[in-house]
Amino acid sequence: MKLHSQFLKLQSHFGGATEISVTMDELALIFGCTHRNAMHIVNKMMLQEWIKWTPKRGRGSRSLLQFLVPSEEIALQSMMQAISRKDVHNAIEGIKTHASSTSLQDTLQGWLLTYFGHHSEIRSDKQIDTLRLPITQQLHTFDPLYMNLLAESFVSSHVFDGLVKRSGEQDKIVPCLAHAWEVDESRTLWTFFLRKEVLFHHGKVLTAKDVVYSLGRLMQTSKRTLYSYIFKEIQRVTALNPSTVQITLKQPNELFLPFLCTSRAAIVPRDLEGMDEQSFGRRPVGTGPFKVVDMTEDTCVLEVFPYYFQGRAHLDRVEILYVPWDTETSSSDTGSAFHVIQNPSSASSSTWSRIHSESSIRKFVTCNTQKKGPLSDPLLRAKIVSCLKDDSASIEQEAIIDQEITLQISTIPQYAGDADFIATRLEQQGYKCNVISVSPEEFKGPIRLESDLIVFSLFRDEDEQLRLFDLYLTLSQHIEPHTRADIEGWLYTIAREPNPVARAESFSIIENRLIKEHHLHILYEKPTQTAYLPSVRGVSFNSQGWVDLRHVWFPPLLSSSSTS
């Protein structure tokens, strides 16, 4: 690998020339080594027949160096060696280094894809099935209290369970850790009856005290997290006996039971089994079908939990790797490319079979009218929002402003491209823009109230109503008082409406009001997809539109010679 890198560094230094005149001292400077070591490197490259070296006698004399192979070939060899060693990180770094060559990048990505997908081997007459998945979001924690990313929620959904869950059929909520539940007439006293002998990954039995601890962590946190408006409505949680939990709400909230289906409400062992929160987030202990056995900056490894109370998963091992380039564009038929891949490109090969989940992502921009500035003027706000519409090219010249206005646009790194698009459209109409991109954690802070425009997204899945409630509650903090009062009134009604259809109608009223008053502008919406090859069996979705790995399986190997 080192010799490969030295060759690529050398050729890059001379701009891809095929023949150069150079001294050994100059080569030593390029390699960052001694004159003697530079000679060794040159000799090694000659033995590999990568270069031809015609020396000139005398120290300081300029010798002739000819490159016999293109850099693409050496880069490919280097990446292949990294992949064969399962050194995905170095393989990816190599691809990023040579990203300027489209053909090389496509070739290297195609080879890297052979690492992902389904891999089976026979051990002690048993087929061991491993699924390797690439993700484009770096994983930080699986602690239900601290998760921010959808990819983290995806892993968490296979490591933890909640008291209840969604069935995926007609928005129905069904038992999970609790086999039954009751609610009193006031809709504030909820009683959950736990299954017996449910095991955590470390072998301890789940009890009501674990539920009390898990919900208590949410109640006591000072962090502003997704769905905090729900769990802050919990007045107390009581363990009536080892298998019965009673939850008292401060006031009725029909979104409480749906909230208990989310990964935020997952049940963890009490006191986190003595671990600090950071350690627990990277090596969590849950009751789910898979357990985390390893986690680094780039890799998360799950192994099946054979004693899962709802039945053992078919897969034995899942390796999830952070891949910081777009894997969607590489779907060539390499013989063992992706079997399961999130968000496939619409240009993917026709050999891929596709199914669609019901989830989608909506990108939007909101206006902060609480901040003293141009957006507090309804007419100017309308002009600014009109610049973002598809037909903005036809805006009359009078829309061009005659005074200098600078707008601050805030977002998170994942949506920086959308923020830049907005800035470009506005700058075309004479507005100056300053885009600020901060981490999801910082985004929850004062940065939003200091900005004029805020770019974010709504993940539309079976938890959409929970997300909408959170979204509109947040938006109400930076809009005019009279509109805020109306929104808070609608949200109060929604929280007490048991019919999800009626709740959806109220959410639509809020959306239409915000759009009409130019507080909200929807940029676009696109569906999420899952592509799979015919060899995959049991593909189904959880409530967030992710593939449920517990049900995925592959046909058995016909013989040991079929291993990959």
Regions found by a protein language model. Give the residues of each.
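Aromatic- and charge-enriched surface segment that lines or borders ligand/interaction sites
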Residues: 16-20, 41, 148, 180-224
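Detector for C-terminal structural segments
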Residues: 56, 113-117, 386-398, 413-422, ...
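Surface-exposed binding/hinge segments that line
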Residues: 63-64, 228-272, 294
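N-terminal lobe/hinge region of extracytoplasmic solute-binding protein
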Residues: 134-183
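A structural "hinge/loop" feature
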Residues: 138-152, 204, 256-263, 531-550
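A bilobed periplasmic-binding-protein/Venus flytrap-type ligand-binding module shared by bacterial periplasmic
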Residues: 303-306, 354-383, 387, 491-493
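Ligand-site clamp/hinge motif
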Residues: 307-349
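Append "and occasionally in soluble cytosolic enzymes with long acidic Gly/Pro-rich linkers
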Residues: 370-430
